[in-house]
Amino acid sequence: MKKQIENWLQKLSQDNIDDNGIVALYFGIYETETGFCLYLTGSKEYDADDDDWACSVDFEPQGNYLSIDSTMDWEQFFNTVSVIIEECVNELLISRPKLFSNKIIAVGFDDGQILRIK
């Protein structure tokens, strides 16, 4: 799964996330019939006390959705994906420091709590 997410993030990072006034990136997750789907959106606003900021979509890169077949339960998937995304973001910070350096980054299920990872 990590390689699949790494490849997806590499493709997404080719869009100009850093040039759009985006202050926060949200990796959303929802369940599908065969597993889960990840997507990325960006917002020009962020509020640490109100997760509704993630609903303010000011940026959606092309190739935004990644379907992942999985038999994990939602908690296990969330924990695994959160760690993988954090690792991938840290790796991309080395190769493209401007990409995520000034961004809030969070992961969450569409109808659940959001976890800030950066």
Regions inferred by a protein language model and the residue ranges of each:
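Acidic, proline/glycine-rich low-complexity IDRs
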Residues: 3-18, 46-51, 57, 63-68, ...
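Amphipathic, interaction-prone secondary-structure segments
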Residues: 14-50
